[in-house]
A protein has these predicted regions:
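N-terminal "mature-domain start" segment
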Residues: 26-42, 50-53, 57, 62-66, ...
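Secretory pathway targeting signatures of secreted, lumenal, and periplasmic proteins
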Residues: 25-30, 37, 44-50, 187-244
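Solvent-exposed alpha-helical segments and adjacent loops
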Residues: 25-47, 102-169
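Signature of long, low-cysteine stretches enriched in small and polar/charged residues
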Residues: 25, 76-77, 83-136, 240-272
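Acidic/His-rich structured neighborhood in mature extracellular/periplasmic domains
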Residues: 139-140, 148-220
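Sec-dependent N-terminal signal peptides
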Residues: 5-14
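C-terminal motif of bacterial Sec signal peptides marking the signal peptidase cleavage site
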Residues: 16-19
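N-terminal secretory signal peptides that target proteins for export/translocation
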Residues: 1-2
Length: 272
């Protein structure tokens, strides 16, 4: 029996995703707590001024603002705002992502990391970095700093998934479920679509930050199906057939100047 391999391709901007067996966290948040403020992928760094201007601060800033992989133009992973410790009060306590750096050789003997959710506001993530010196903190960031950026990005995606779980395009989800027996929580702004056998394309026709989402399936024939070259070739074939360009003979394809990222994942304990 042949199984079918289902792919979801999010084009232009990766806005949403699905949450697996996750109850809505939005509904459970306390009504007595202020909601976190700020934009997605924005982080406030609270750090001593000398340390911020030194090696550790520069390294932390460079890691937080490193380009997002896979985009045709450089865009920073996070937008960084800085505050000195004495400025960290009032409304700044409600920023959605906060990195609080404390350097004190009389209190700390090594670098420690403490992560706390909803410290001052709901929907907030606070990371506290403790270190005995700026040099030791810099050495730690050289080895582990990118994992902190990846963690912040993961938390932003979780927030978006939680939001889309409770507020998404019902008709898009219904069509994908009927066609592919899968769920797709797309933004409510989706307005136009193309629906054929084994292929579904939906767009919001946005003039700024347009969102296109494509779902398609094809037969699984061998282990070679899950290689990067095969998946890219299949994607180009499907998009070339279904999404024509503005000029005769043009069509959507993979940009070859940027190597596609590829990662095998498991869902509910199954390879996919």
């Amino acid at each position: 029996m042949r199984t079918r391999f289902l792919l979801t391709l999010i084009l232009i901007v990766l806005i949403g995703g699905t949450a697996c067996n996750r109850s809505s966290k939005l509904a459970k948040q306390s009504i007595f707590m202020k909601r976190a403020t700020g934009f997605a992928y924005e982080v406030l760094v609270v750090m001593d001024k000398d340390a911020w201007k030194g090696e550790a601060g520069r390294l932390l800033y460079d890691q937080l603002t490193a380009p997002i992989p896979g985009l045709p133009q450089n865009e920073p992973a996070m937008r960084v705002t800085y505050a000195e410790p004495f400025q960290f009060n009032g409304l700044l306590h409600y920023v959605r992502n906060i990195i609080h750096v404390r350097i004190d050789e009389s209190l700390y003997t090594k670098v420690s990391v403490h992560k706390e959710k909803d410290r001052w506001a709901t929907g907030q993530e606070v990371v506290t970095l403790n270190a005995p010196s700026s040099q030791i903190l810099a050495e730690y960031l050289e080895k582990q700093g990118t994992s902190l950026v990846a963690w912040l990005g993961e938390k932003e995606r979780e927030r978006q998934a939680d939001y889309l779980e409770s507020s998404h395009s019902v008709w898009v989800n219904d069509k994908v479920r009927a066609r592919f027996n899968a769920q797709l929580y797309a933004p409510e702004e989706m307005c136009s679509y193309k629906d054929t056998a084994d292929f579904f394309w939906v767009t919001d026709h946005g003039t700024r930050g347009r969102i296109d989402m494509v779902v398609y399936s094809f037969p699984y024939v061998s282990g070679r199906t899950f290689t990067l070259d095969y998946l890219v070739a299949m994607r180009d074939s499907v998009l070339g057939e279904h999404i024509q360009g503005a000029f005769p003979g043009s069509y959507m394809t993979t940009e070859k100047r940027f190597t596609p990222s590829y990662e095998a994942i498991s869902k509910n304990g199954e390879y996919c």
